């Protein structure tokens, strides 16, 4: 007889989590009647994921019945102070209940009791009847119910990631038993439920007390023996409050429910009515997947484990997935791969198949349909397989359609209704427990991932076509992935000995600064401790408290606080200098050494699908954040050198590309004229805004202020922000901005128009159809709406600038290949491209690179690329 399994879901909590998991896409989730549906959709995905994984024989979703419960009768402020439930969420609740009805899932609520009490009562009844129980919630209150029969899962991220609490896991994570978890909440209180707890007792202190005394009762039995302290005083004063909090936090496992376990038998959905409901909600993908279970998927797609390969297993229409165990494909291992052919799915962990002549020849001669081409190209290069540019990259396609969430396969599955795939953390585990399971289970996981890709590829293609974004994928992002893969494989030589020399020099500087700080302080202390520094500055040295704010951990010594204090306290300037050099030392001078591989190079990874504007970022290590303003930061670039002695590094950097894009997009005649005439744009702006007649009369301060206004406008800066940047009053800053818009009316018109369009469409686009979703553009919250409006203004500018650089890189790579040059692109940092150029090609290459970048696209103003070359990146910059 199959084991009886009961799934108990805290419906109110999980629905709320589902709402906010898809909140950034709020305006995309509306049905034809205008009803928001993101919570309904997310709730359904959570349910389907749980049904697939838990396979319950019995199930119940419990809801809170209302604000008045037996707890509010004993403590009127219980759950008081909670923010108002968003109307967009409230309107979906009746439909969540309707969804449950159609899915054949019992739901229940009980006057005067909370969902937790219903769950707790059924949990104990089910234990007595021999059930295995899984409880699911969005908050941790229910953890107290875990025992040898009950697992409590708390949703962590999105709609499919949960943290499973058992007694062993709770002990491992917190050192507590389930009963002690109640006592911890009694001590800490709970802001979300407005449970008071004991004043200034947090999690760390609460756990310490419970480990010492065993329970809340034990703490108070031993309180007389505690040392005199503020904590002891608070415990004594708040004793009544602590025991009230324990009562409030304890789940009632004997609630007078009117249902029994026999009422919770799960026999599946009412397919016909559920399909109609999906139609009403506009859930097309869910409708298509309605009759599919994981077993159906595996059987329908003919999953086969492969140890040998033949030509009839391969097709130009095949879709591939290559599984990396880890994140860094330059160093971590390929562990298996899967591919489709017609209706068949194949999966293998036999990596030697990559050397099979049939397979290797196919891979190298076919433009693959694949997930994450750049990763795959770099990985397979390690096996001697050299891929062509891709036919279709599913990861990049998803990224172009939505930048709100990540682009992992599990996320794609959640978004498009494939409920049979578990996320990698759930499947492999995490931390020291992360491991590949037995072979058949592992390969089935790869097959499920591939099934998601097979099912979603046509959906993504259709949506890209509807958005007019196929050209963006085929002509920009996919060719760029090929270029970036080649750059990553090439890497750049970084001389460790140079970094070691810098490390030694910096250590002397840090030691000297430390001694100078001690002398000014009149004592020795830990300069790296914000707490000790705060006490020194604001208590011992008596610096003005209005410059800082005090939190639970002490006085704020953040950079903005210290910069305001620096003019009045010499020690603060030294501390700022110390922090800057210490940061450079630890993060870059020492940090970069760990990323130099056996070939003497750093192989950074360019992340193509992270930013919402389309800009590239780099990780492992991040080379885009190497400090450029400080000389000590710039010196790090001396360690970056060419691979060959007869070569140099050539750096080519777009000049003021975002302002040039702004001129083109806004069609402002004055800005266009200044760029067309080759004028210094900041000097020209200063003349127009400050009423200066001649360029010669523009001071350095005038130009600096004009530059701040120019770039501030690009980022939608406020008068408050500009006043902080320039150290002037808000009134002066507002006058600058008002005058700027008077003198450059095209820019003001652009800003107004792009915000209007964003409100209508819910998104903005670059010159090349790259979209930035703006779900908050019509928010009733002024601050949230204001941020969305600034984003609407900036994204087409910043995104178009990023796109132009991508076009230049693609065209430059084509030119290098066509000309048979030895020159290689090595790095892309912000608006800069760094190449290694043989000296014999330098004259020709400087001309080619400059021409390619400046002619990447025709704007109404010229694009300008500035070049420098040198024996190191430092000299080239």
From Swiss-Prot:
Single-chain monomer with multiple functions. Residues 177-270 form the 5'-3' exonuclease domain. It comes from Streptococcus pneumoniae (strain ATCC BAA-255 / R6). Gene3D superfamilies: 3.30.70.370, 5' to 3' exonuclease, C-terminal subdomain (1.10.150.20), 5'-nuclease (3.40.50.1010), Ribonuclease H-like superfamily/Ribonuclease H (3.30.420.10), Taq DNA Polymerase, Chain T, domain 4 (1.20.1060.10). One of its GO terms (biological process) is double-strand break repair. The lineage of its organism: Bacteria, Bacillati, Bacillota, Bacilli, Lactobacillales. It comes from the Bacteria. Its EC number is 2.7.7.7. The keyword DNA-binding applies. It catalyses: DNA(n) + a 2'-deoxyribonucleoside 5'-triphosphate = DNA(n+1) + diphosphate. The keyword Hydrolase applies. Belongs to the DNA polymerase type-A family. This is DNA polymerase I.
């Amino acid at each position: 007889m199959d084991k009886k399994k009961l799934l108990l879901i805290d419906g109110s909590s999980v629905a709320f989590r589902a709402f906010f998991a898809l909140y950034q896409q709020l305006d995309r989730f509306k049905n034809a009647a205008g009803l928001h549906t993101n919570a309904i959709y997310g709730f359904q995905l959570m349910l389907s994921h749980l049904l697939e994984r838990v396979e319950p024989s019995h199930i119940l979703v419990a809801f809170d019945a209302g604000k008045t419960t037996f707890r509010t009768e004993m403590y009127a402020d219980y759950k008081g102070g909670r923010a108002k439930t968003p109307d967009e969420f409230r309107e979906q609740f009746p439909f969540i209940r309707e969804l449950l009805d159609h899915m054949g899932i019992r739901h229940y609520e009980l006057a005067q009791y909370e969902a937790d009490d219903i769950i707790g009562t059924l949990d104990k009844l089910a234990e007595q009847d021999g059930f295995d129980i899984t409880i699911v919630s969005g908050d941790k209150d229910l953890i107290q119910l875990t025992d040898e029969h009950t697992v409590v899962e708390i949703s962590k991220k999105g709609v499919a990631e949960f943290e499973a609490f058992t007694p062993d896991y709770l002990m491992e994570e917190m050192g507590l038993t389930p009963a002690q978890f109640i006592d911890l909440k009694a001590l800490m209180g709970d802001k979300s439920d407005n449970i008071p707890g004991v004043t200034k007792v947090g999690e760390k202190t609460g756990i310490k007390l419970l480990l010492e005394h065993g329970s809340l009762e034990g703490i108070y039995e031993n309180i007389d023996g505690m040392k005199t302290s503020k904590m002891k005083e608070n415990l004594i004063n708040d004793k009544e409050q602590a025991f009230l909090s324990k009562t409030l936090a304890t789940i009632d496992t004997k609630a007078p429910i009117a249902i029994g376990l026999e009422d919770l038998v799960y026999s599946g959905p009412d397919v016909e009515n559920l399909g109609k409901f999906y139609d009403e909600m506009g859930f097309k993908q869910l409708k298509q997947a309605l009759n599919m279970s994981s077993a159906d998927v595996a059987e329908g797609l003919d999953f086969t484990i492969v140890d040998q390969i033949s030509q009839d297993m391969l097709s130009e229409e095949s879709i591939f997935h290559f599984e990396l165990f880890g994140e860094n494909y330059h160093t971590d291992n390929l562990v298996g791969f899967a591919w489709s052919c017609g209706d068949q799915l194949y999966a293998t962990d036999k990596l030697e198949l990559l050397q099979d002549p049939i397979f290797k020849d196919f891979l190298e001669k076919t433009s693959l349909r694949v997930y994450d081409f750049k990763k795959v190209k770099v990985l397979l290069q390690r096996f001697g397989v050299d891929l062509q540019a891709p036919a279709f990259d599913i990861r990049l396609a998803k990224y172009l359609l939505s930048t709100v969430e990540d682009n992992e396969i599990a996320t794609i599955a959640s978004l498009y209704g494939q409920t049979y795939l578990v996320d990698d953390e759930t499947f492999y585990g995490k931390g020291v427990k992360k491991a590949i399971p037995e072979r058949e289970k592992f390969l089935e996981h790869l097959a499920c991932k591939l099934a998601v890709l097979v099912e979603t590829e046509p959906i993504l293609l259709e949506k890209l076509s509807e958005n007019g974004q196929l050209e963006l994928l085929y002509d920009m992002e996919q060719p760029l992935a090929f270029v970036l893969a080649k750059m990553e494989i090439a890497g750049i030589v970084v001389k460790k000995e140079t970094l070691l020399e810098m490390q030694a020099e910096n250590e002397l500087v840090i030691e000297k600064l430390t001694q100078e700080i001690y002398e000014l302080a009149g004592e020795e202390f830990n300069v790296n401790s914000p707490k000790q520094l705060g006490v020194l500055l604001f208590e011992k040295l008596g610096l003005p408290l209005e410059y800082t704010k005090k939190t639970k951990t002490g006085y704020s010594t953040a950079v903005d606080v210290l910069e305001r204090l620096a003019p009045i306290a010499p020690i603060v300037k030294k501390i700022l200098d110390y922090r800057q050099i210490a940061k450079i030392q630890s993060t870059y001078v020492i940090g970069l050494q760990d990323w130099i591989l056996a070939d003497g190079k750093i192989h950074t990874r360019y992340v193509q699908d992270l930013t919402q504007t389309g800009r590239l970022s780099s990780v492992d290590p991040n080379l885009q954040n190497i400090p450029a303003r400080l000389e000590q930061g710039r010196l790090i670039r001396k360690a970056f050198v060419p691979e060959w002695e007869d070569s140099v590094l050539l750096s080519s950097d777009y000049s003021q590309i975002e302002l040039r894009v702004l001129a083109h997009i806004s069609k402002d005649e004055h800005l266009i004229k200044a760029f067309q005439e080759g004028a210094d744009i900041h000097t020209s702006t200063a003349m127009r805004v400050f009423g200066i007649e001649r360029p010669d009369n523009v001071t350095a301060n005038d130009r600096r202020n004009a530059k701040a206004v120019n770039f501030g406008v690009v980022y939608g800066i406020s008068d408050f922000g500009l006043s902080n940047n320039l150290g002037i009053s808000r009134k002066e800053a507002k006058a600058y901005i008002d005058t700027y818009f008077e003198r450059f009316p095209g820019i003001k018109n652009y800003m107004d128009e792009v915000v209007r369009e964003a409100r209508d469409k819910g998104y903005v686009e670059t010159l090349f159809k790259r979209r930035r979703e703006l779900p908050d553009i019509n928010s009733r919250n002024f601050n949230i709406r204001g941020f969305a409006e600034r984003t609407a203004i900036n994204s087409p500018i910043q995104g178009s600038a990023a796109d132009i650089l991508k076009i230049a890189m693609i065209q430059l790579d084509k030119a290098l290949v066509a000309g048979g040059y030895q020159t290689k692109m090595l790095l892309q940092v912000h608006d800069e491209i760094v190449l290694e150029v043989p000296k014999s090609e330098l004259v020709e290459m400087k001309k080619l690179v400059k021409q390619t970048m400046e002619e990447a696209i025709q704007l109404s103003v010229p694009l300008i690329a500035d070049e420098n070359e040198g024996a190191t990146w430092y000299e080239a910059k």
